[in-house]
């Protein structure tokens, strides 16, 4: 049997998953997106050329890799076509390398309209969504009224279903949010224009992955966002609308959980977050600005600047537990270069003075929490582009070792730059 590897974020997303997936797909036959939508932003740099993917799996740039958008992903046809066209204009044969589950829910214009109307209505209490219709599309899925890719095989029936659901959502848009209605005919025409392109890529993903595993082919599952944004286990309600954790692999792809052999958690050497929500180690001083500028912490999807802070081991430990992590890949270590000292959060001081070492579950319970830090010496030497473990500064090695000690999880991969070549692999997940 083949070895199946999951790559996911351990923080609030933006950990650098895309590069690592691209790197490891050199050995994989399939790369599978199993949750989220085009709210993800995965940046790849190959031989100096930058590619940003939102919906298509990061394996698409590899000749011998099949990329799969599985049933757990909410699919926006317009976003997919835009991404496909951009890649095809560069000579990448996307339609030969991409497969789609017919069970993928569709994101349509009324989902986007609802998403933005709700954020506008929340005002100061806005969650900070990407405004791309992700949440409303998942709502329709759970309410069993959503349209899926498979519905496009019967265009007449699709048109009837679309009319019913647009009337349903327009009632809310117009009467409650006082926003314009979504035009039915325009929406229908747009989706019909690409219907055949989508259905031509449809495959039974669950069956395909099961047979691939039985044949010994290697499968990689590419997570989007991060553990702390999981709908169930994240800082609710400041979360995304899907299961970003390892448990989402089985439900989001149709391959049983026993077929997962290794879970790689991507851990940025410091913390970042986009949008509202708890962030105990957030920095508002010069150091926070330094991390943001040096780390180029601006969203690949929205362009929004990210909040920055020190590494939070308490939150990382939660990710270890939930995902049963096999190993870490530490990214952006080079951003810490030049700092006199680096800090790691090892506890939370509660308003009553007590110190806890677990994360609260509800967002309100995070109020008043102060981080308890362990301070370590920084390093002046550059780690950027270093490709050998022994050539890293001793202080940087000590930092990595301390993370391993505090979490009980080995750092198997270290990323020292954006290019796929700027990586130190201590243990390959496919060989672990």
UniProtKB/Swiss-Prot annotation:
Q: Looking at the UniProt record for this protein, which Gene Ontology cellular component terms does it annotate, in alphabetical order?
A: cytoplasm
Please classify the protein's predominant subcellular localization into one broad category. cytoplasm
Protein family membership: Belongs to the adenylosuccinate synthetase family.
Put simply, this protein is called Adenylosuccinate synthetase 2
**Catalytic site positions:** 14 (proton acceptor), 42 (proton donor)
| Function comment | Plays an important role in the de novo pathway of purine nucleotide biosynthesis. Catalyzes the first committed step in the biosynthesis of AMP from IMP.
Under catalytic activity, the entry for this protein gives: IMP + L-aspartate + GTP = N(6)-(1,2-dicarboxyethyl)-AMP + GDP + phosphate + 2 H(+)
> Which keywords does this chain's UniProt record carry?
Cytoplasm, GTP-binding, Ligase, Magnesium, Metal-binding, Nucleotide-binding, Purine biosynthesis
Cofactor: bound how, per the entry note? Binds 1 Mg(2+) ion per subunit.
Cofactor(s) the protein needs: Mg(2+)
User: What Enzyme Commission number(s) appear in the record?
Assistant: 6.3.4.4
Q: Name one Pfam family in it.
A: Adenylsucc_synt
Coiled coil ranges (UniProt) are: none
Amino-acid positions noted as binding IMP in the UniProt annotation, renumbered to this chain: 14-17, 39-42, 130, 144, 225, 240, 304
The compartments listed are: Cytoplasm
The pathway noted for it is: Purine metabolism; AMP biosynthesis via de novo pathway; AMP from IMP: step 1/2
């Amino acid at each position: 049997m083949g070895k199946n590897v999951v790559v996911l974020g351990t923080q609030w997303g933006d950990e650098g998953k895309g590069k690592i997936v691209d790197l490891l797909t050199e050995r994989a036959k399939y790369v599978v997106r199993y949750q989220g939508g085009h709210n993800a932003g995965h940046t790849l740099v190959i031989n100096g050329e930058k590619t940003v993917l939102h919906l298509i799996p990061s394996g698409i740039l590899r000749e011998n890799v099949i990329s799969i958008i599985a049933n757990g992903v909410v699919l926006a046809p317009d976003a997919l076509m835009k991404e496909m066209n951009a890649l095809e204009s560069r000579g990448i044969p996307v339609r030969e390398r991409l497969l789609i589950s017919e069970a993928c829910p569709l994101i349509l214009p009324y989902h986007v309209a609802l998403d933005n109307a709700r954020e506008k209505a929340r005002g100061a209490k806005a969650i900070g969504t990407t405004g791309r219709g992700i949440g409303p599309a998942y709502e329709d899925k759970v309410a069993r009224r959503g349209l899926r890719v498979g519905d496009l095989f019967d265009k007449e029936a699709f048109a009837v279903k679309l009319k019913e659901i647009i009337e349903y959502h327009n009632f809310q848009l117009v009467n409650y949010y006082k926003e314009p209605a979504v035009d039915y005919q325009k929406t229908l025409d747009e989706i019909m224009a690409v219907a055949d392109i989508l259905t031509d890529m449809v495959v039974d993903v669950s069956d395909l992955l099961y047979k691939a595993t039985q044949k010994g082919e290697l499968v990689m599952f590419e997570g989007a966002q991060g553990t702390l944004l999981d709908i169930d286990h994240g800082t609710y309600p400041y979360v995304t609308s899907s299961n970003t954790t390892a448990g989402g692999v089985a439900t989001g792809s149709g391959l049983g959980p026993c077929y997962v052999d290794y879970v790689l958690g991507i851990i940025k050497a410091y913390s970042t977050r986009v949008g509202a929500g708890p962030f105990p180690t957030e920095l508002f001083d010069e150091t926070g600005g330094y991390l943001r500028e040096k780390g180029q912490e601006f969203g690949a999807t929205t362009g929004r600047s990210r909040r920055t802070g020190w590494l939070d081991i308490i939150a990382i430990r939660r990710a270890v537990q939930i995902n049963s992590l096999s190993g870490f890949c530490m990214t952006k270590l080079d951003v810490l270069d030049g700092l006199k000292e680096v800090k790691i959060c090892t506890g939370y001081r509660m308003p009553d003075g007590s110190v806890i070492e677990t994360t609260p579950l509800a967002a309100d319970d995070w109020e008043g929490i102060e981080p308890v830090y362990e301070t370590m010496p920084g390093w002046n030497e550059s780690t950027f582009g270093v490709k050998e473990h022994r050539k890293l500064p001793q202080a940087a090695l000590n930092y990595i070792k301390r993370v391993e000690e505090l979490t009980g999880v080995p750092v198997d991969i270290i990323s020292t730059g954006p290019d796929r070549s700027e990586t130190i692999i201590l243990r390959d997940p496919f060989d672990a």
